[in-house]
Amino acid sequence: MKSKHICEILKNENIAPGIFDMTVKFPENAQPGQFVHVLCGGDTLLRRPISICECQGGILRFVYQVRGKGTELLSKKVPGEPVDILGPLGNGFNCEYHDGINVVIGGGIGVFPLLMLARKLPGTVAGIFGFRTKELVVLEKDFSVVCQRTYIATDDGTYGHHGLVTDILKDLINSEKVGAVYACGPVPMLSAVKKITAEHGIFCQLSAEQRMGCGIGSCAVCTCKSHGENVKVCQRGPVFDAEDLDI
């Protein structure tokens, strides 16, 4: 039985255009890469899956982008209000030691769940994060605390590297020993990361961003392909070993 909690909102801050940073009281622990299913209120019947940014000391933090009616309603909530949360759900990242530096690489909303992962990984961690433009760059200070190195890329060149996060990944792999790569973001980015790491024999895990319905495996909204078969991301994922994800 999945755990449901009525949680008190502590913060719901607008940190960039359309992006909010929420913290709530939460009684459970979570693993990096897991997510929660949030009932946003109003007449929205389905919950919204949101990746966990941090979870420690009885506090759950998630950063989310307003993309529809549900998250729009969520963005209007204020401290002191209750929010109905199901979770934590899904399978998280493998945080075991690998010889060489760890690289966490994210694009867009795929950046947010990597903060807790970067905090928990052993050894040196390099973070590579991609955004559309400078005004959407978030969590840079947070990552600078838990990563020994951080790199930012923007699509339009208004901040950091002008280009793809995978450009930076290739440079890192060519200049030093990379032990493991952990990625979350859009499918084209994940596909490129899978190809690059496979070519160099580097351990890689990918977190799939799929639209979800129930979040507990009862529907088939979040299916993806793994070794030619349909699998439910909410049950088998959202984190997969790269070789297990057909992208």
Spans of features found by a protein language model:
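Short, Lys/Arg- and Gly-enriched loop/turn segments at beta-strand edges
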Residues: 44-52, 90-97, 234
